[in-house]
Amino acid sequence: MAKLVAFHEESRRSLERGINALADAVKITLGPKGRNVVLEKKYGAPQIVNDGVTIAKEIELEDAYENTGAQLMREVAAKTNDVVGDGTTTATVLAQALIREGLKNVAAGTNPIALKRGMEKAIKTIVDGIAEVAKPVEGDMIAQVATVSAGNDPEVGAMISEAMAKVGKDGVITIEESKSLQTEMEIVEGMQFDRGYISPYFVTDPERMIVQLNNAYLLLTDKKITSIQDLIPTLERVARSGRPLVIIAEDVEGEALATLVVNKLRGVLNVVAVKAPAFGERRKAMLQDIAILTGGQVISEEVGLTLEDVELTMLGEASSVTVTKDTTILVSEKGNKADIQKRVEQLKQQLAETDSEYDKEKLQERIAKLVGGVAVIKVGAATETELKDRKLRLEDALNATKAAVAEGIVPGGGVTLLHLASRIDALLPSLSPEEQTGARIVASALAAPVAQIADNAGAEGAVVVENVRAGDFNYGFNAATGAYEDLVSAGIIDPAKVVRSALQNAGSIAGMVLTTEALVVEKPEPKPAAPANGGMGGMGGMM
């Protein structure tokens, strides 16, 4: 495949055109009065969205050079979304401002490497400033953060605030699509995993097809149980105690399963068998989690235990067990609090060390199941288009809330960056002249989010920036009401982590674009001409 190569100014200008095409489509969504963008879909109805990263992912440009710029800009949004799940539009607006001013200076002959160095030093000063001014989240701030992030939707704010209050900061909140018009929340207490009963003959409530057991013993093993002989000593002990039994094993089959079913149907023993959750090493870890939560032991040959050795003291205990054909929920207060806390600390350590997004998600889920539970928000709406938009807003709000809990909050509406820009003046004397130019570019770009929020609200961006700059740190423009006020008192707050990530990712991409001297893209292949349609052949003569 042949390649096209562009150099110097030509390469940078092509990148800038692509960057502007994407940024101009994304930035109109910023703020409470941000506009919507309609995305055409190959199949189904067009999608109406107000979410920066979703718009960025849809943009592909015809010109290969310009498309490269658009893809770089998409990376800013995607990276910010991966780290904090919100702030993608702010990152895009900042990156566009940094690149626009930076390219003017590179074209005028400034050394791009020195320019980049100055920008990096200025951004570090601002990042340190964000950490200094951030305040911990307290009271109704969680609802305020969620409301702002969901595009000023107080209902969303209240729901996420309630979910956070119920499951705690280590809990897991998931967002699903609802079958109804209402948006509702469901709290799952205790430990839930995606494995149901092995046989429907175990059900205790035939109408709902579920198993409901109270004050049950739990036998946990990583073995496959096929012979009933292994289980007889345990079954006899549990039967004498008069309590139900839940068996969680790799599998229960053959003679063992048949005997358990017969005993259940005859009323000799109230029992249910469930396959252990997950696979391989993760299965062993999850069994251990269940054991710690229920005060039991995992019967495993790795620790020298077999099913014949089981005593009642080795079994876990649960105050309530609910098993459907797909899920199991265990509620137990029998676990040792110190052991549970130790296990949670261990999992948090693993969470800090892993780079895999999948592993992070699974570890976070395991922590949540140990400490408090899971909240499921089911999003409802009148049309599918509205449902998709509402779900995206809820996801943004949830991510912003988690970020606020992690690193605290700062005044919103873009004013934190605008007010911190003055700190760059103190940095200038220590920089070389060309580095100073880079630092000044950052200082002027920090006004871009405030200006864009004002423009989207129908105000004059440059005027708003000057008015806000004259006020104290919390003072800013409330685009929802058109008033200048103390934004923290008005509940307009941003998570510090979102503001920090947006600035760092914007600076990273801007630095790369400014130091680009050549651009290599694939040469588009000419489309083959459509073949001419042949005429119909004549009919042969009849004999």
From Swiss-Prot:
One of its GO terms (biological process) is protein refolding. Keywords: ATP-binding, Chaperone, Cytoplasm, Isomerase, Nucleotide-binding. Pfam families: Cpn60_TCP1 (PF00118). It catalyses: ATP + H2O + a folded polypeptide = ADP + phosphate + an unfolded polypeptide. GO terms for molecular function: ATP binding; ATP-dependent protein folding chaperone; isomerase activity; unfolded protein binding. Belongs to the chaperonin (HSP60) family. Together with its co-chaperonin GroES, plays an essential role in assisting protein folding. The GroEL-GroES system forms a nano-cage that allows encapsulation of the non-native substrate proteins and provides a physical environment optimized to promote and accelerate protein folding. This is Chaperonin GroEL 2. It comes from Thermosynechococcus vestitus (strain NIES-2133 / IAM M-273 / BP-1). The gene is groEL2.
